[in-house]
Amino acid sequence: MPVVYKRILLKLSGEALMGDGHYGIDRAVVEHIVVEVAGVLQLGVEVAIVVGGGNIFRGMKSAGDGMDRVTADYMGMLATTMNALALHDAMRRNGVVSRVQSALRIDQVVEPYVRGKALRYLDERKVVVFAAGTGNPFFTTDTAAALRGMEMNANIVLKATKVDGIYTSDPLKNKDAQRFQSLTFDEAISKNLQVMDATALTLCRDQKLPINVFSIFKTGALKRVIMGEDEGTSVFV
């Protein structure tokens, strides 16, 4: 059965990387994610990843606690770079070739973001991990995922979370919450379902770039989404 999506932008939240912990990186979770990514690479799918940093530092919370918002956001971008390096190292150990590109210049550690090079890496079947969000304060890593998805000519943005889709309310807090199989962008925005922030949703809607929200912890879920099976929640125009 052929894949439905040839090139994907995978958004990994920092919270997903810490697993059941409250801080930091769960190595077993990172290894699981790498195995899932390796599985779709074997199908010929090209993979770009945007990673968050909330497992290490939450800029908006720190700004709310009195820290300067711009400073807090830059610290959050550095946290995403740490996560990107952890993913890169896990991929190396599992035989997956990857490159890390950062929207902030840290040349001794990672490459700067250059769209042409990133596209070439994808053509060469290398995984590209994007760090530091958009490189600008006040923009979330969800918005970075939408932006990089468009720049990389991705067929879909896949948001990997701890739950298996979008629900009427938080299923971890409300056992009666119902999962949506699919939604339009306008429905997701009007219902304020917290799929992604409004900027990211609007960007994807305007560029007709679909989104799927799924659980990265379900073994094989990523592959099922790629194959077009009923997995997660699809958001489309």
Swiss-Prot record:
Its EC number is 2.7.4.22. Pfam families: AA_kinase (PF00696). The keyword Transmembrane helix does not apply. GO terms for biological process: 'de novo' CTP biosynthetic process; UDP biosynthetic process. Coiled coil: none annotated. UMP binds at residues 53, 73, 134-141. One of its GO terms (cellular component) is cytosol. Keywords: ATP-binding, Cytoplasm, Kinase, Nucleotide-binding, Pyrimidine biosynthesis, Transferase. InterPro entries: AceGlu_kinase-like_sf, Asp/Glu/Uridylate_kinase, Uridylate_kinase, Uridylate_kinase_bac. Inhibited by UTP. It comes from the Bacteria. It is found in: Cytoplasm. Its main location: cytoplasm. ATP binds at residues 11-14, 54, 58, 161, 167, 170. Catalyzes the reversible phosphorylation of UMP to UDP. NCBIfam families: pyrH_bact. Homohexamer. Belongs to the UMP kinase family. This is Uridylate kinase. It comes from Nitrosomonas europaea (strain ATCC 19718 / CIP 103999 / KCTC 2705 / NBRC 14298). The gene is pyrH.
